[in-house]
Amino acid sequence: MRPPRTTELDRPMTTAASQRPRVPRRLLDGVLLLDKPVGLSSNDALIRAKRLLLAKKAGHTGTLDPLASGLLPLCFGEATKFSQDLLEADKTYEATMRLGQRTATGDAEGEVIDTRPVECDRAAVEAALVRFTGEIVQVPPMYSALKRDGKPLYEYARAGQTVEREGRNVTILALALLACDLPDVTFRVTCSKGTYVRTLAEDIGEALGCGAHLTMLRRTGVGALTLEHAVTLDALSDADDASRDAWLQPVDALLSTFPLVRLDETSAKRFLHGQRLPLSALDPIDAAEGERVRVYDATRLLGVARKANGVLAPERLVVTAA
């Protein structure tokens, strides 16, 4: 019996998209300091940058709200091993809050739920900022990604539900007034991991007796990294391949605040095999007990180790150094 004849209608349709050759991705190691625009999620920004750089492996170092702009460090290849260190790092922001109005979300996207007269002056604002410097307790906002019973808080909020949240200790390392054009107040804050600048603005507004919400947020620093060497997606898109690669910083840009240890050839080989190195066999290491250090041979980053119990113990190794 002959097999049935196929017709043009039976054949799978081909399109320009299906015929387009796939662009090969490449292994790329380094850090891209991206100046994220307002309106784009951190994940979408990562996807665009990864596509422009034709990179195989990439990740970001903690989300920046779509309504916020500014510094978003992106890690490629071996740099992804050290992204956790930036998650733990202090952050610096410039923010503008509007006094006299509270919103459902704590920012300009939410519905105004409370309006009060603004009866304070610049001196009162400056005094309030001083009160919020140092260790403070924050109650996380309902419109946040924190989870309760496996569900983000913002899902409860969108359903009109309020979930009880416990206050958390955070540290405001610096809080400076940049402009006071009431009812708008612009400030710069350097804060510990887990600080909600929206909540900080709301709490300052309550301390001033008029409430407040955030109208602008721009991140200018993550640990030792700053916007000074950041690139926008538009600039990255307009650049040629060589110029795009030039924006990549080396992996150890993430580790610049770690004490430095340099090993001889023999010790470097042992380190790359995951062996602990007795401190007695090494040059003195300027690091406290239990402190993490960045480890190099004569020219290359080998990884990160911890100085503890008389040894230098490898924790993260750079594969490309092996």
From Swiss-Prot:
Stretches the record annotates as Disordered: 1-22
GO molecular function, one term: RNA binding
Pfam families reported for this sequence: TruB-C_2, TruB_C_2, TruB_N
GO biological process, one term: tRNA pseudouridine synthesis
Bias-annotated ranges (Basic and acidic residues): 1-11
Active site: 65 (nucleophile)
Keywords: Isomerase, tRNA processing
Name of the protein: tRNA pseudouridine synthase B
Organism from which the protein derives: Burkholderia lata (strain ATCC 17760 / DSM 23089 / LMG 22485 / NCIMB 9086 / R18194 / 383)
